Amino acid sequence: MASAPSTTASGLAPPPFSSARGARLLPGALLRLPPPPASVGSFRVVGPAAAPPGGRRIASARVRCGAAVRFIGQSEFEAEVLQSDLPVLVDFVADWCGPCRLIAPVVDWAAEEYEGRLKIVKIDHDANPQLIEEYKVYGLPSLILFKDGKEVPGSRREGAITKAKFKEYLEPLLSTSTVA
């Protein structure tokens, strides 16, 4: 015959973690979670999780097939953008910018879709204040198209954008040959 759980004077069972049951709750003994998976969705997460010595935290990268969008800085701007044989779409972004993260998949798609016709680079707003000032970037994300080392008139675009609107924005700019 099984005995019923003990009760207190009020007739109720003691709270599950009270010493009345003879067990004590130990820190760290409550819940042990397995480590996070090595992949998220269809992408494999790679890259450092912590800040490098003396530097800012670097966001994890997503590994994809096709063209990659590179981050460049002030020192690479002239060679990568102004001296490029291809038109270059510069995406000014910041890691704290929500709309920048929203359009990142669209920009990645465009790098693959227009590979060979267009180069796309990203510039970190916080790490490149001279470029931000020189090109008068007031909102994020900001897109500016450069051809033959000059900004294409009417190519500036600020804010999040859908893939369809991105194509509507980019196609006419790639077909024109006018520069400022």
UniProtKB/Swiss-Prot annotation:
Residues 65-175 form the Thioredoxin domain. Disulfide bonds join C97-C100. The record marks D91 as: Deprotonates C-terminal active site Cys. Residues 1-64 form a transit peptide. The active site is at C97 (nucleophile), C100 (nucleophile). SUPFAM superfamilies: Thioredoxin-like. Gene3D superfamilies: Glutaredoxin (3.40.30.10). GO terms for cellular component: chloroplast; cytoplasm. Keywords: Chloroplast, Disulfide bond, Electron transport, Plastid, Redox-active center, Transit peptide, Transport. The record marks G98, P99 as: Contributes to redox potential value. Its main location: plastid. Pfam families: Thioredoxin. It is found in: Plastid, Chloroplast. Belongs to the thioredoxin family. PANTHER family: GEO12009P1, THIOREDOXIN X, CHLOROPLASTIC. Thiol-disulfide oxidoreductase that may participate in various redox reactions. Possesses insulin disulfide bonds reducing activity. This is Thioredoxin X, chloroplastic. The lineage of its organism: Eukaryota, Viridiplantae, Streptophyta, Embryophyta, Tracheophyta.
